[in-house]
Curated annotation (Swiss-Prot):
Top-rank taxon, per record: Eukaryota
Domain statement: The presence of a 'disulfide through disulfide knot' structurally defines this protein as a knottin.
Native organism: Phoneutria keyserlingi (Brazilian wandering spider)
Protein's name according to its UniProt entry: U6-ctenitoxin-Pk1a
Tissue: Expressed by the venom gland.
Cystine bridges: C3-C17, C10-C22, C16-C34
Gene Ontology terms: cellular component: extracellular region
Length: 36
């Protein structure tokens, strides 16, 4: 895949589409998703 869209599970920022960051929805907790 070219990049992971918003809401996609991820392990690092570089897997996410341009402008998205790999972040948890709850601070410092897994799982992490491509979010703003």
């Amino acid at each position: 895949i070219a990049c992971a869209p918003r809401g996609q599970l991820c392990f690092s920022d570089k897997l996410c589409c341009i402008g998205l960051r790999c972040k948890s929805r709850v601070a410092n907790m897994w799982p992490t998703f491509c979010l703003v």
